[in-house]
Amino acid sequence: MEYEFRRRIDDVVYRFAPDGLVNGFPAWKRVDLDIRLIRHADKGWCTVDSAGTINGRPWNVEPEEQSAAPFEGEWVSKKNDKSYVYDLVKLTDGSAAF
């Protein structure tokens, strides 16, 4: 199973492929960059860079409300002075954006 982050402002799509386990939960890695989608012990589902810095999270979904799978829906990211809104979509056959 793969996921896509679909950026709302310009329709840029980032695909994440399975990448083993982190903290006892499945993890995914962005196919073009060292960014991972993981379940953080305190923060819940998030994206992290290679240093482990959180740079994306579900919008308005607290960790205790999250399930064992990444939250599908609205996410926000922050990199330096820029923030973006994305939709996280679980891919099924034929549902990829590209």
Show the residue positions of the predicted features.
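Interface elements of modular peptide-recognition networks comprising either
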Residues: M1-F98
